[in-house]
Regions:
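Helix-loop-helix hairpins and the membrane-proximal interhelical loops
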Residues: 1-24, 150-221
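Membrane-embedded alpha-helical modules
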Residues: 65-170, 271-365
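Helix-loop-helix junctions within the multi-pass membrane cores of secondary transporters/permeases
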Residues: 1-9, 27-108, 219-307
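Solvent-exposed, flexible loop/coil residues
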Residues: 53, 173, 178-183, 241-242, ...
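Buried hydrophobic packing segments
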Residues: 11, 59-60, 211, 253, ...
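Alpha-helical membrane-protein architecture signal
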Residues: 132, 191, 226-230, 329
């Protein structure tokens, strides 16, 4: 969470959320995660763990031109409805599965690269903060890769405090949820809502199912997507983007460390849900705590946390010879940040990649 939350906060800033809307957004994510994990694990007796979409937050943070927070909420509602449709209409799920993995990975890599590069923009203004943290991340990742992002956050907070860059800390308080009526802006729906759905499905839900199946569980796809889609839809009006199946957290909860007996590992779900319910309760305080930290630190924490995912996505995108050109086209357009007809680069990157792939395969017939 230490590396993922700054990405969410970057997303809230990108769409112009107020402090109250930001607190509601973060708490809504906690509510959706807690409810999804609790319902799915208890009903299925499987360790089905939910999470918010970190790649989705990265997409929001890197999508320019969103006219208002309410327009972003409209995109969140659309993404949630599309997830529910995927649960109800099986051919739609098959269509998503037919998007080549290299194209999906290239779109994800382009989204993540923009946030990774953003941390280097703070080097000229805060070199004494950013550069030591980059060195710490490299060293920590070599010995304790799972704790590297947390180490950067903790060390960065201490370093920022010693440099006098930390604002006064907020008092502990409960979150007040704020309802937002969505605005239906066509460009935002197409440029943010559709890519958010695709990123959530391709980068979170499909790997989440793969982790569960690799651990010997056979979760029913439609009910799982229905629960996460419904949770996403309900909390979208609180300003929260999509929730989905977890992959990394699920790998922990589905392994022998959770319980020696695979049939009893589902118990991890309620405990996991309880933590996120507590997180939702004090979301405003958590947001206030992170808001007290300097932007350079948050950008560095987010960027270093995404380095591994970016490297993995780049490797998946460019590893195969057959689709490499199409993947490179998707990557280039997505990372460019270009906006056509008011629609963001992630959508156009996907379109260009699929177009290159279709032309290439047609000419090779």
């Amino acid at each position: 969470m230490g590396g993922a939350l700054p990405i969410v906060l970057a997303a809230t800033q990108a769409v112009g959320a107020t402090p109250e809307q930001t607190s509601s957004w973060v708490s809504g994510l906690g509510i959706a995660t807690a409810l999804s994990a609790l319902i799915l694990s208890v009903r299925s007796r499987m360790p089905i763990i939910a999470a918010w979409s970190t790649p989705g937050a990265a997409l929001i943070a890197s999508t320019p031109g969103v006219p208002s927070f309410a327009a972003a909420v409209g995109a969140f509602v659309l993404a949630a409805v599309l997830i529910l449709l995927t649960a109800a209409v099986r051919p739609l799920g098959r269509l998503i599965e037919k998007i080549p993995a290299s194209i999906a990975a290239a779109m994800l890599a382009g989204i993540l690269l923009r946030l990774v590069m953003a941390m280097f923009e703070h080097v000229p203004s805060a070199p004494l903060l950013v550069l030591p943290l980059l060195l710490l991340f490299v060293v920590a990742r070599a010995f304790l890769p799972t704790l590297a992002s947390l180490a950067v956050l903790v060390a960065g907070a201490l370093l920022a405090w010693s440099l006098g860059l930390v604002k006064p800390l907020p008092a502990l308080g409960l979150t007040t949820l704020e309802f937002t009526m969505p605005v239906w802006d066509v460009a935002t729906l197409v440029g943010l809502g559709v890519p958010l759905y695709l990123v959530t499905m391709a980068s979170q839900n499909l790997p989440g199912f793969a982790v569960l199946r690799a651990s010997g569980y056979q979760p029913p796809a439609s009910p799982v997507l229905a629960v996460t889609g419904a949770a996403s839809l309900g909390t979208a009006f609180l300003g929260s983007h999509t929730s989905n199946l977890a992959a990394i957290s699920a790998a922990i909860c589905t392994g022998p460390d959770a319980h020696p007996d695979p049939a009893k590992r589902w118990i991890a779900g309620p405990f996991y849900a309880a933590f996120w319910a507590l997180f939702a309760l004090f979301g405003a305080s958590v947001v206030g705590l992170f808001a007290a930290l300097p932007p350079a630190l948050l950008a560095t924490v987010a960027g270093t946390a995404l380095l591994g995912s970016t490297a993995g996505a780049l490797g998946s995108a460019l590893s195969g010879d057959q689709d490499r050109l199409a993947a490179a086209g998707t990557l280039a357009v997505t990372v460019s940040g270009v906006s056509l007809l008011g629609i963001g680069s992630a959508f156009w990157g996907l379109v260009i990649g699929l177009l290159i792939l279709a032309i290439d395969r047609f000419l090779k017939r």
